[in-house]
Amino acid sequence: MGLSFSGARPCCCRNNVLITDDGEVVSLTAHDFDVVDIESEEEGNFYVPPDMRGVTRAPGRQRLRSSDPPSRHTHRRTPGGACPATQFPPPMSDSE
């Protein structure tokens, strides 16, 4: 099985976005595609009845951009690879 675009004819495709012949920018999602049998490409038959259409797999996790703020649970390492030593004041003696 493969995916075939079922919408407007693309003239440019980059990063899951296409520009239609009318200049409209369209963001692509898995729902914009029809499931097709790749072997049917040789026969030239790309039509898939609506009852056979479906998403074959869920979209993957999106990667974080470097401009995104870090999560509260994200642990960042120092350039040396180790956690920095915590600086505690010296213990107080009985004479103080």
Curated annotation (Swiss-Prot):
Residues 44-96 are annotated as: Disordered. Residues 87-96 have a biased composition (Pro residues). The keyword Translocase does not apply. It is a lipid-anchor. Changing E39K: In strain: 17 syn+. Changing G54V: In strain: Nonneuroinvasive mutant HF10. The acidic region is required for efficient packaging. It is also involved in recycling the protein from the plasma membrane to the Golgi apparatus, and in the interaction with the capsid-binding protein UL16. This is Cytoplasmic envelopment protein 3.
